[in-house]
């Protein structure tokens, strides 16, 4: 019984990580390769870019960079999952994510270094990736253990303990929605910036 219990936990964690790494390989690695390609193009076409930038006129375009590092203060929300303090911590995280402006605005001027803009955005992109990876692994481990505890519940396990595990699973599912929002905002912001930069290095 105990052996089967732990094998179930390991199986759930393994399956979750396989899916997560597939997501990473598909989206993050593709964006990373595109970033490196654009940085090479900037270096290769430096003179042409400088000429194009010096001829800029009219109102300046704005580059928007998603500031993932703003959210590092919420990394400990995971510790509150399943506890009475979770609702307040979750609400703070959700409100900050929805209501606050997490974008760094950089106007495009003739003195602007495109390489700096791409690297600055890539830095935030990687911060988001690390935040998500750490969160996802911890979350899936906790969730796998709780779901298995519920599945293997017997009369020896108190009903209150089952309820606690179910609450933890529910809290982690709610957090998963916010985690995905952080990821999607980061991917969208960085890819849009790369597309915008590409217009100046053709």
Where are these regions (language model features)?
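Long, low-complexity or tandemly repetitive, helically biased scaffold regions used
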Residues: 36-202
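Low-complexity, intrinsically disordered, cysteine-poor segments enriched in small/polar
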Residues: 4-19, 23-30, 34
């Amino acid at each position: 019984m105990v052996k089967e219990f732990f094998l179930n936990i390991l199986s759930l964690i393994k399956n979750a990580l396989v899916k997560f790494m597939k997501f990473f390989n598909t989206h993050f690695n593709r964006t990373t390769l595109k970033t490196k390609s654009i940085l090479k193009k900037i270096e290769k076409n430096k003179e042409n870019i400088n000429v194009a930038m010096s001829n800029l006129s009219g109102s300046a375009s704005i580059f928007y960079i998603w500031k993932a590092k703003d959210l590092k203060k919420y990394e400990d929300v995971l510790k509150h999952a399943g506890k009475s303090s979770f609702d307040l911590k979750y609400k703070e995280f959700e409100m900050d994510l929805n209501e606050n402006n997490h974008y760094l605005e950089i106007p495009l001027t003739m003195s602007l270094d495109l390489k700096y803009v791409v690297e600055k955005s890539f830095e935030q992109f990687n911060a988001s990736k690390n935040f998500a990876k750490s969160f996802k692994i911890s979350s899936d481990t906790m969730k796998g253990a709780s779901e298995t505890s519920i599945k293997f519940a017997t009369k020896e396990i108190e009903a209150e303990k089952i309820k606690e595990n179910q609450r933890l699973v529910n809290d982690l599912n709610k957090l998963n929605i916010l985690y995905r929002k952080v990821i999607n905002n980061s991917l969208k912001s960085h890819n849009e910036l790369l597309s915008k930069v590409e217009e100046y290095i053709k």
